[in-house]
């Protein structure tokens, strides 16, 4: 793996898992076909997911390991993807940090005691012990038992910047006023918040690995709001800390959206795989990034078309990769709720068929 890692903990990797197309691609080794998995592959576009969701709140689904595992395994096997990703949410970690989290139906997540000042940063708890999230690790353990033996399981977390932005804004944002105000006016408080967040995330990821995840993804969904200079000064050291502290040997996927101006800096922060959105050509991004695996970058809105268009657009992405080892096919964003399931199935089938090495 590309990073000099200092993290500890067990890493569960059988020979069958090590040799899977997904794990081979993470190591930039040739695979029998281009591996494919999809962000939010367990989600509202599936009737079976909606049936489960009708019985539980979103947080209940995350906090009931059997339920989280059920939707994870069902989606992975139904779609025949090359990796599963545990059903959870990037914001679960904020509760042990002392922040009040709510998912109101139809309104998205809200943090009721946001951080806006140095005094607020002081009250954010240092998460030395991540056992409060044992429901996530139990979901990982159950899922690892229930998945096909050779199918890798991905754990994940939000990146320090995206998590800190939620913490400062108290929810979603278009302009990140509270986040950037703290960043620009009190750099000390900002770095203190990011450091606390990064340490918590490292421990959280390693606990998922110890429970049975074979790889991890770090979601920096909001980092495209930053200039390269701001990223380097206010974000890069903290994301690098998270990645360096992941258990050695575990592939790290470093994903962001709107990051065309930040790709080289993201690589500098670390990751064995850089996740790309649809706004940058895969071949051009890869030329800039050099010796690293890439993940992406099908536009999730194209899944609203039909199987023929889906197949044609999948071919375009694969042609940009040109069969080079180290490409993991994915979307540039999560699957949207109204997406026709048959188009998602068609995408996975097309990737497998079109990329099969003769």
What does each model-identified segment do?
Residues 2-6, 14-15, 122, 149, ...:
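Iron-associated oxidoreductase/ferritin-like identity signal
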Residues 95-99, 114, 164-168:
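Short, conserved acidic/polar surface loops in the N-terminal third of protein domains
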Residues 100-109, 169-174:
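A glycine- and small-aliphatic-rich helix-loop capping segment at beta-alpha/alpha-beta transitions
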Residues 106-146:
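A gly/proline- and charged-residue-enriched helix-loop-helix capping module
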